């Protein structure tokens, strides 16, 4: 049975973005997940149902998820449904993000608890139900994971992404000067290199589900090409190395 790659888009994105990843996973079926869930409690049923159906017809299921799509995947999926995950600018601590947005909007927790929902000037609606849900349902993630993170990501701090990577034994690659939204020519080139150089088709997977390079390079193992702004920083699973 073949490998299937499922792409989960971020806010404002679409399943059609999966087309970009077909060239990066040439021997796989790549499909975009056109989900409708707007919250983790809605995603629990929708995501698990979709991935269960896909998993039944493949030998290996690879997840590629972007931004909020990564968070909804984190809150809905498990190692029984997904074999390996690639996260691009993932939201990994929704409680922290909501609290940050409350500060940006000058909204106290007491005010949000009283009003339940508050619209903001930056286009987001703060929700007391959402905040309570993520506090009551902490993320539990055991799937081998690789993360691509932009150094200038305004939604998730370096401290937060490193803490998640260390806690969940995930491999973290940082693009110097990169943003939350990978969209410029340089950023997309970096993203493509990242996937190509971390793919098992170019590498030999080890017992932990991560891949070890099967090629020789002048750079240290698994490092990505230097793209003007400096070399990528790659933190292997379990490493406490600082950026």
Protein language model annotation of sequence segments:
Residues 64-69, 73:
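Gly/Ala-rich beta-loop-alpha elbow adjacent to hydrolase catalytic centers
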Residues 82-163, 167-174, 178-201:
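The alpha/beta-hydrolase serine catalytic core
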């Amino acid at each position: 049975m073949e490998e299937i790659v499922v792409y989960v888009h971020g806010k404002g994105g679409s399943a059609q973005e999966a087309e970009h990843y077909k060239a990066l996973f040439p021997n796989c079926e790549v499909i975009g997940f056109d989900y409708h869930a707007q919250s983790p409690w809605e995603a629990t049923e929708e995501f698990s149902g979709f991935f269960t159906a896909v998993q039944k017809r493949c030998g290996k299921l690879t997840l590629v998820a972007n931004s909020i799509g990564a968070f909804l995947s984190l809150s809905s999926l498990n190692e029984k449904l997904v074999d390996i995950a690639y996260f691009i600018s993932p939201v990994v601590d929704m409680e922290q993000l909501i609290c940050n947005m409350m500060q940006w909007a000058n909204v106290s927790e007491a005010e949000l608890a009283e009003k339940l929902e508050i619209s903001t000037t930056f286009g987001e609606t703060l929700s007391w139900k959402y905040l309570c849900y993520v506090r009551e349902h902490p993320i539990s993630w055991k799937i081998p994971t690789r993360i691509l993170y932009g150094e200038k990501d305004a939604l998730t701090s370096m401290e937060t992404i490193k803490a998640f990577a260390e806690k969940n034994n995930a491999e973290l690659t940082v693009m110097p000067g990169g943003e939350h939204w990978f969209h410029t020519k340089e950023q997309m080139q970096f993203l493509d290199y990242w996937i190509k150089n971390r793919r098992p088709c170019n590498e030999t997977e080890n017992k932990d589900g991560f891949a070890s390079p099967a090629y020789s390079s002048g750079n240290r193992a698994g490092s990505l090409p230097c793209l003007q702004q400096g070399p990528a920083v790659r933190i292997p699973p379990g490493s406490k190395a600082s950026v």
